[in-house]
């Protein structure tokens, strides 16, 4: 059934990457960091997937959008 109980072990609690590493500012020019939070299709990954806190998710979204606007990151990934 779709709504039945889950089988298996306990889920691991997701930890915010930025809080854990003491990062207070997300720079839009740091494309290697931003790429970690973008899917293979080029979409921004949601909080429930990455475990990022709400504060840093907002900062991350703004940084990714700025990087896209400045052509540092693609809006969509190349089709192979």
From Swiss-Prot:
Q: Which Pfam families match?
A: Ribosomal_S18
Q: Which UniProt keyword terms apply here?
A: Ribonucleoprotein, Ribosomal protein, RNA-binding, rRNA-binding
GO molecular function terms attached to this record: small ribosomal subunit rRNA binding; structural constituent of ribosome
* SUPFAM superfamilies in alphabetical order: Ribosomal protein S18 (SSF46911)
Q: Which cysteines are joined by disulfide bonds?
A: none
Look up the domain of life of the source.
Answer: Bacteria
* PROSITE patterns linked: RIBOSOMAL_S18 (PS00057)
Query: Listed GO cellular component terms?
Result: cytosolic small ribosomal subunit
Keyword field contains Cytoplasm: no
Its BP terms in the Gene Ontology are: translation
Is the keyword Ribonucleoprotein in the record? Answer: yes
Quaternary state and interactors: Part of the 30S ribosomal subunit. Forms a tight heterodimer with protein bS6.
State the family named in the UniProt similarity comment for this chain.
Belongs to the bacterial ribosomal protein bS18 family.
User: What task does this protein carry out?
Assistant: Binds as a heterodimer with protein bS6 to the central domain of the 16S rRNA, where it helps stabilize the platform of the 30S subunit.
Q: What is this protein called in UniProt? A: Small ribosomal subunit protein bS18
What organism does this protein naturally occur in?
Staphylococcus epidermidis (strain ATCC 35984 / DSM 28319 / BCRC 17069 / CCUG 31568 / BM 3577 / RP62A)
């Amino acid at each position: 059934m779709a709504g039945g109980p889950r089988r298996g072990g306990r889920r691991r609690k997701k930890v915010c990457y930025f809080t854990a590493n003491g990062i207070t500012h997300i720079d839009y020019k740091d494309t290697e960091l931003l790429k970690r939070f973008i899917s293979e299709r080029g979409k921004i990954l949601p909080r429930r997937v990455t475990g990022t806190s709400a504060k840093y998710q907002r900062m991350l979204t703004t940084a990714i959008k700025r990087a896209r606007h400045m052509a540092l990151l693609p809006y969509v990934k190349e089709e192979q």
